Amino acid sequence: MPLSSPARPALAPVRAAAQDVLDPAHLRAALRVSPADATVAAALRCGAAVALAIAVPGLLGRPDLAAFASLGALTSLYGRYDPYRRRAALLATVGTLMTGTIAAFTLLAAAGTPALLTTAAVALLAAGATAFCLLVRTGPPGATIIVFAAGAGLAGAPTLADVGPRALAAACGALLALLVCTAGVLVRPTAPARLAVRRAADAVRAAERPGAAPRAAAAARGAVARARDVLADDASWWRTRAAVPALAAELDAVERALDATGVPRGDTVPAVRTTLRAQARSRAAGPWRLPTARVGAAGLVAGAVAAVAGLGHAAWATMGSTAVLQGESARHAVVRALQRGAGTVAGALLAWPLLAAPLGFWGTAAVVVVLQTVTETIVSRHYGLAMLTITPMALLMTSLAHPADPSALALDRALDTVLGAVVGVLAVLLVHPRTRLRASETPGPPR
């Protein structure tokens, strides 16, 4: 019918996305365990940062601030493979964002801001944090932890007098994370570059195995390119410059194994400092606007539905949708939604007896540190399995600041997360670029 034909091109992206979202292969992908490397050192750094951050308020007689300090210490999750100078800049920036977020949302809660307005503020934060993470390429966990900080700021019934102590605790935690995660520069400043070359070699070997998936070659080329970026950064610093030629020659050999036409470039590594500002400028024209819009829209809807439904922590719903949308494709969003939803429900059941147990402050702190360390060793292998430790850890951290009914806390976490995951997938279906398709054009295959 003529009246309906104009709507068909507009619905084409939705139909294509629906075909992609409903692909049964996503369920198999959600069950698959991925290979991972170099996770132990990063896990130990994160565990040490969280342990120190929790211990300081506990020893100072302010256990109620331990949760905010440990949140600040979660900046240690970022930049784990970056060269030390970039890692320091990234951790300082993320730590500032975390501290400011906790302060701002504590202030909103203390001022008695209506729930729907705070929900809108959390969604706006999620969108802004997503844009930041995409532009400066923070990598996992992306904007999720920053949104978690907003939920922590809103938790409890804070007064204006709580704003400063909470922010100070978060800043101290972030500072400890910065010190722990950059301490290696004093002993072996070239360690990130050596690790990058080793990871590139491992990726190339994986791509050359018989029966390797087609995407393994692309992953190997990405690892080689990443290693070259790290070497270029090292070449611009006097403390690491001397080791660059040998590492570049090693990387050339790795690349030639992947591509016989590779040209040796060991003596011509450019000295390029990898600054956050330069990275953001180089990616400003890239595809960051659509993911940002999806995160903002999904966060607003998920948080509003949770608030209207009377769920106890509406910000967790926004965090759930944000986590689902931190990837680059519909496939990633669906797999992440399945893993996060199922993993959180199971994790909430595991958290219930831990929350009800009389662990005391130091017992709870010890469990949080162990769970955090274990999480970082498995999260890159299987996100759903990691949720079995992430969920109890997050709820125990919450209980450090605000003891609550264990069953209510666990139920809120499960419901809010599942709601957020569902809304995140809906955002993939419904939020698309505004494009005009001529009547003669045929939509391309789903991506």
Provide a role label for each language-model segment.
Residues 1-51, 55, 59, 63, ...:
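Cytosolic regulatory and coupling regions of membrane transport/channel systems
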Residues 196-205, 361-381, 437-438:
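A compact, surface-exposed functional segment
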Residues 18-27, 44-54, 58, 62-84, ...:
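Pore- and pathway-forming membrane helices of multi-pass small-molecule/ion transporters and channels
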Residues 86-106, 347-350:
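Hydrophobic transmembrane alpha-helices and their membrane-interface boundaries in multi-pass
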Residues 30-42, 60-61, 83-92, 111-114, ...:
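Short, amphipathic, aromatic/basic-enriched membrane-interface segments that mark the entry/exit
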Residues 285-358:
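Core alpha-helical transmembrane segments of integral membrane proteins
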Residues 100-111, 131-134, 153-161, 179-187, ...:
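Alpha-helical membrane-embedding segments
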Residues 236-242, 329-330, 356, 372:
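A cross-kingdom feature marking solvent-exposed beta-strand/loop segments within repeated
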